[in-house]
């Protein structure tokens, strides 16, 4: 056991402990600390999982003061998940209430960027023996803290995409009136596809609606100091969703520089770092400070001017710094909201108002304000587990079995109406309406049709001849039978819904939208993989072309073009090709448009005799539609020299050639140097995947994002002689010393007296939770 350290500077930098400490011999304190550390380590490293036959445990992801997280595989489907075990979940009231709060919140939320509960294992033991809670969550390989402080490339596109997902999930959370209060990189889970999910809702609280709730809001507030908003440190009593936006700004700045923005060693140092960048708070903020001594301390400091963000992050994107400056402000009301941040130009590439939902209804924190005993909390957790399974079984029943629908009462069939043929004689059409009154007319018109009923003709008279095209009786009978059969078939096959009242369209459920988003994400992943494959293939071809052809290799080798781009490239290549060499007998090509003056003098003679006139080539053809000159390729006889020996030039004795009225481009006499540039521009017409490149390998996460608390294994393995004055080390932990109240609550059920806890607290360098107003002395270190 290492020799006990001397007391560090503490939160106030005065070297005095936060409160009265009982003086004990060094040997006694060391033995007590050793015993407590052994107990703490044994309890936290309990990794025995009893998950039955449904899941197969793969490996442990992380462990902490609240539980252990392991990756697992569901045997039925092969899906990989994360299982969080909370051992002895009901021993300490604070921890039990934290578990209940997190279960309720995660059951209420359904969002892509918030960790989701996939299952809660039912207890397999009697109620009296039920002690451990198993929660099945989404499996994420790493967290943002591991990504930032690793050798993994982190481009501006990665930063943009991570920030967008964080704000998208935060907008959904804030719409439910929930404040996370503990946002930090290790609580943001990330996978190899750059997907981000917010985790660890054990510290979440609702909005404060009255001054009486301020104390409730600060209960158990032991969040990481480096990401804590100024209103919490200065007791401004303005606890809104802007608290989370300050944390997001600190995370944003950490991603840009890959180092913490405000890594304070204690409360005073933290406040000094903030004022070094943001300057002295405004008089309104200073007057709102709740403690008189804190207000006097800030006023005694020399005034500071804010430092431009371009100086803090030289070379960073201007739009990124603009958004960062709107997040990190002393006044909570002056900070940008999550919804407004999503509309910032820096995130315009991903912003889609239709795909950034809100949460309805708001989450109810009424249960959290009640004074609950351990037994009542245990009953509430068991009720939450049963409610989760009841809802899931109800959804499955709705999917498997449709509700039985009562058939519609059969109505009497429509009477059969025999429609007369339009070509049938008027005597066959029986009119039931009264005959119209005859109109007075001077004489009978020869073409008038008498619609009045006429007496049937005598039997002796022959029947009028049947006109061509009339509907026969057999056809009428067949149509009547077909209509009757169709009506009976409809009544027999479709009794589930009334014909006159069609079933209303069902609203789109959250699960359907989730499936749509998963399908979109899958397509994006496929496009990203295809793009990566094309890039590797292009690099391979370029390397092969460079080896075989040297500097003269084709610069377009491996470039993938669409059909339209390839067609445009071929046209451009034809335009850029030099004209084919012509023999001496060939006349020079005329301009593409406009009459050219014929030369009056003799043409210059070539250096070789002309070929036979029988094989003379035809004149070049001009396409009228395009106005482009397309000379036919001419093959010189074998006896002629190459094209370099011929020099046939057009001759215009009256001056320069007339301009082309159509403005058509002239064919070039040499290879155009812009073909490569044009080709690359044409290739950009293809739709690009906006997502950043996937990670080739993600570092293993610590499991902190699953809400297991601080990592005891990493914490206890550190050397005890590493004082706080040495400063935090990047990449080792993303939090300063945590609160001793966590340890006190955790060991509450073991009968440890305050002296033992205080001794262990000093041994492992854990500070007591306090506000800046409680510090006995405020002096700059």
Swiss-Prot record:
Compositional bias of kind Pro residues: 433-445, 454-463, 578-594, 601-614, 653-664
Q: What is its EC number?
A: 2.7.11.24
Instruction: Give the region (Necessary for oligomerization) as residue ranges.
Output: 140-406
The UniProt regions of compositional bias labelled Low complexity, in chain numbering, are 476-486, 615-632, 642-652
Q: Which reaction does it catalyse?
A: L-seryl-[protein] + ATP = O-phospho-L-seryl-[protein] + ADP + H(+); L-threonyl-[protein] + ATP = O-phospho-L-threonyl-[protein] + ADP + H(+)
ATP-binding: is it a keyword of this entry?
yes
Cellular component, GO annotation: cytoplasm; nucleus; PML body
Kindly state which keywords UniProt assigns to this record, in alphabetical order: Acetylation, ATP-binding, Cell cycle, Cytoplasm, Differentiation, Kinase, Nucleotide-binding, Nucleus, Phosphoprotein, Serine/threonine-protein kinase, Transferase
Which one GO biological process term can you cite for this protein?
cell differentiation
What lineage is on file?
Eukaryota, Metazoa, Chordata, Craniata, Vertebrata
Q: Where is this chain compositionally biased, Polar residues type?
A: 668-685
- List of residues that carry Phosphoserine: 685
Q: For the region Disordered, give the residue spans.
A: 1-27, 402-708
Checking SUPFAM superfamilies in the record gives:
Protein kinase-like (PK-like)
Motif segment (TXY): 219-221
Q: What is this protein called?
A: Mitogen-activated protein kinase 7
Its subunit composition reads:
Interacts with MAP2K5. Forms oligomers. Interacts with MEF2A, MEF2C and MEF2D; the interaction phosphorylates the MEF2s and enhances transcriptional activity of MEF2A, MEF2C but not MEF2D. Interacts with SGK1. Interacts with PML. Interacts (via N-terminal half) with HSP90AB1-CDC37 chaperone complex in resting cells; the interaction is MAP2K5-independent and prevents MAPK7 from ubiquitination and proteasomal degradation. Interacts with STUB1/CHIP; the interaction is enhanced in the presence of IGF1 or MAP2K5 and promotes STUB1/CHIP E3 ligase activity.
N-acetylalanine-modified residues are where?
Answer: 2
- Enzyme class, UniProt record, top EC level: transferase
Region listing for Required for cytoplasmic targeting, in residue ranges: 2-77
Binding, ATP: 61-69, 84
Cross-referenced CDD domains, in alphabetical order? STKc_ERK5
């Amino acid at each position: 056991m290492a020799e006990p350290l001397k007391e560090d500077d503490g939160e106030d930098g005065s070297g005095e402990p936060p409160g009265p400490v009982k003086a004990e011999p060094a040997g006694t304190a060391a033995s007590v600390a050793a015993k407590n550390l052994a107990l703490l380590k044994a309890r936290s490293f309990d990794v025995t999982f009893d998950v039955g036959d449904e899941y197969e445990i793969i490996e442990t992801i992380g462990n902490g003061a609240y539980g252990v997280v392991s990756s697992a595989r569901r045997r039925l489907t092969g899906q990989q998940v994360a299982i969080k075990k909370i051992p002895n979940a009901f021993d300490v009231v604070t921890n039990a209430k934290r578990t209940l709060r997190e279960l309720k919140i995660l059951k209420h939320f359904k969002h892509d960027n918030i960790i989701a509960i996939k299952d809660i294992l039912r207890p397999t033991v009697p109620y009296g023996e039920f002690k451990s809670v198993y929660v099945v969550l989404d499996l994420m390989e790493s967290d943002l803290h591991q990504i930032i402080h690793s050798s993994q490339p982190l481009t501006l596109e990665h930063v943009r995409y991570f920030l967008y997902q964080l704000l998208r999930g935060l907008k959904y959370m804030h719409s439910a009136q929930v404040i996370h209060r503990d946002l930090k990189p290790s609580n943001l889970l990330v996978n190899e596809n750059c997907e981000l999910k917010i985790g660890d809702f054990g510290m979440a609280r609702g909005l404060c609606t009255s001054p009486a709730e301020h104390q409730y809001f600060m209960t158990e507030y032991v969040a990481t100091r480096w990401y804590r908003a100024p209103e919490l440190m200065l007791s401004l009593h303005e606890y809104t969703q802007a608290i989370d936006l300050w944390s997001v700004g600190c995370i944003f700045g950490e991603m840009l520089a890959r180092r913490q923005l405000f890594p304070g060693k204690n409360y005073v140092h933290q406040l000094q770092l903030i004022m070094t960048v943001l300057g002295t708070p405004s008089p309104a903020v200073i007057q709102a400070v709740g403690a008189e001594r804190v207000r006097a301390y800030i006023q005694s400091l020399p005034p500071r001017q804010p430092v431009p963000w371009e100086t803090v992050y030289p070379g960073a994107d201007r739009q990124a710094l603009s958004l960062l400056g709107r997040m990190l402000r002393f006044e909570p009301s002056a900070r940008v909201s999550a919804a407004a941040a999503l509309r910032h130009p820096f995130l315009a590439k991903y912003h889609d108002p239709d795909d950034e939902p809100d949460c309805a209804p708001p989450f109810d924190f009424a249960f959290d304000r009640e004074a609950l005993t351990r037994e009542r909390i245990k009953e509430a957790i068991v009720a939450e587990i049963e409610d989760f399974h009841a809802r899931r079984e109800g959804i499955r029943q709705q999917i498997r079995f449709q509700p039985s629908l009562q058939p519609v009462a059969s109505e009497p069939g429509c009477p059969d109406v025999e429609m007369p043929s339009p070509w049938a004689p008027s005597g066959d059409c029986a009119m039931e309406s009264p005959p119209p009154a005859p109109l007075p007319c001077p004489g009978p018109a020869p073409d008038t049709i008498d619609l009045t009923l006429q007496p049937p003709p005598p039997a002796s008279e022959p029947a009028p001849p049947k006109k061509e095209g009339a509907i026969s009786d057999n056809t009428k009978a067949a149509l009547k039978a077909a209509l009757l059969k169709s009506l009976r078939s409809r009544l027999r096959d479709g009794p589930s819904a009334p014909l006159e009242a069609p079933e209303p369209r069902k609203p789109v459920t959250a699960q359907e939208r989730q499936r749509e988003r998963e399908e979109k994400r899958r397509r994006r992943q496929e496009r990203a993989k295809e793009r990566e494959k094309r890039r590797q293939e292009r690099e391979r071809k370029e390397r092969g072309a460079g080896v075989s052809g040297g500097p003269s290799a084709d610069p377009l080798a491996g470039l993938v073009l669409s059909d339209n781009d390839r067609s445009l490239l071929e046209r451009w290549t034809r335009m850029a090709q030099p004209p084919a060499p012509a023999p001496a007998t060939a006349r020079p090509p005329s301009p593409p448009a406009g009459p050219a003056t014929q030369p009056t003098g003799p043409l210059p003679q070539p250096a070789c005799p002309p070929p036979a006139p029988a094989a003379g080539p035809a004149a070049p053809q001009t396409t009228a539609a395009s106005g482009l000159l397309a000379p036919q390729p001419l093959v010189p006889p074998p006896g002629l020299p190459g094209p370099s020996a011929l020099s046939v030039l057009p001759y215009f004795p009256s001056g320069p050639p007339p301009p082309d009225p159509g403005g058509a481009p002239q064919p070039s006499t040499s290879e155009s140097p812009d073909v490569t540039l044009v080709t690359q521009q044409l290739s950009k017409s293809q739709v690009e995947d906006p997502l950043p490149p996937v990670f080739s390998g993600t570092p293993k996460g610590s499991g902190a994002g699953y809400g297991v608390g601080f990592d005891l294994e990493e914490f206890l393995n550190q050397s005890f002689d590493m004082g706080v004055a040495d400063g935090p080390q990047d990449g080792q932990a993303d939090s300063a010393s945590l609160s001793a109240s966590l340890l006190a609550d955790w060991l509450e059920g073991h009968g440890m007296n305050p002296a033992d806890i205080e001794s262990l607290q000093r041994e492992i360098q854990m500070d007591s939770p306090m506000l800046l107003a409680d510090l006995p002395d405020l002096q700059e270190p």
